[in-house]
């Protein structure tokens, strides 16, 4: 029972970290703010965080609403629930990578709250690609299947965050990611294993064709290490922004794969 209670504490803390969903104070009594162990719950927390968007997809699918309108609303709800946390990371990362002449200038740009050209373009592409991918495949699934596919994608994208986080050292001291700690090896394994397993089961329940499932996992397997190598070359480590960007890029890759193969 103690292990289950600790896992649920980690789920609650992960939900608080990854979203704007209110979490009761009792989960934070005596908590030091570290996420080294709590990251194991990221995939489970992702499913809870994505339930509102999945419900919207189900309702609009059952009402036979326009696929483009449904896709826009689903992405909008996701951004509202998370407070656009991951989108902010993608925008800052794009500005830093695109405008930074070297490591130091890239990190300095990423600290600037103002959005630049590279960040704006990255966000337009992220929203556009996710909306177009959802509009392409949601009408081909049942309303229930569409909602479940969103949950599967969410679990994979948050597992990707943990992998990126664990593979690189902090690029700077005092950042959000550095203060949250480094994922414990066991927690990283649990996050990756549970993320992949949950996604596999949920894709099956959603009625996703086998070829689409494997293509989505291939996209996951290419996007996450690929971006991590770029971050290592550009910054020599991770930041909170690159962790958020990992989530966005993984979601785009997986949704794009589903749109191509379903």
Curated annotation (Swiss-Prot):
What does the entry give for GO biological process? cobalamin biosynthetic process
Spans traversing the lipid bilayer: 41-61, 65-85, 115-132, 134-156, 195-215
Q: Where in the cell is it found?
A: Cell inner membrane
Q: Which Pfam families match?
A: CobS
On whether rRNA-binding is a keyword of this UniProt record, the answer is no
InterPro entries named among the record's database cross-references: CobS
Cellular component, GO annotation: plasma membrane
Q: What does the record say about its membrane topology? A: Multi-pass membrane protein
PANTHER family documented for this protein: ADENOSYLCOBINAMIDE-GDP RIBAZOLETRANSFERASE (PTHR34148:SF1)
Q: What is this protein called?
A: Adenosylcobinamide-GDP ribazoletransferase
* Source organism: Rhizobium meliloti (strain 1021) (Ensifer meliloti)
């Amino acid at each position: 029972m103690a292990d289950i209670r600790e896992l649920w504490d980690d789920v609650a803390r992960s939900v608080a970290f990854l979203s704007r969903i209110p979490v009761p104070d009792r989960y934070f009594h005596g908590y030091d703010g570290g996420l080294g162990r709590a990251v194991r719950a990221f995939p489970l927390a992702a499913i809870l965080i994505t339930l509102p968007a999945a419900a919207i997809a189900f309702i609009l699918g059952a009402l036979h609403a326009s696929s483009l309108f449904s896709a826009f609303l689903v992405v909008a709800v996701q951004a509202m629930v998370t407070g656009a946390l991951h989108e902010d990371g993608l925008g800052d990362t794009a500005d830093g990578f695109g405008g930074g002449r070297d490591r130091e200038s890239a990190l300095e740009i990423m600290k600037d709250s103002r959005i630049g050209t590279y960040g704006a373009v990255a966000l337009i592409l992220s929203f556009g690609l996710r909306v177009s991918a959802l509009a392409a495949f949601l009408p081909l699934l049942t309303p229930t299947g569409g909602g479940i596919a969103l949950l599967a994608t969410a679990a994979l994208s948050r597992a990707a965050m943990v992998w990126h986080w664990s593979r690189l050292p902090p690029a700077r001291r005092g950042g959000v990611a550095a203060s949250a700690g480094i994922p414990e090896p066991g927690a990283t394994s649990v996050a990756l294993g549970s993320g992949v397993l949950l996604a596999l089961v949920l894709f099956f329940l959603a009625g996703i064709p086998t070829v689409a499932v494997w293509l989505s996992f291939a996209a996951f397997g290419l996007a996450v290490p690929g971006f991590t190598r770029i971050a290592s070359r550009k910054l020599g480590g991770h930041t909170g922004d690159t962790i958020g960007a990992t989530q966005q890029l993984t979601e785009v890759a997986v949704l794009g794969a589903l749109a191509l193969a379903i």
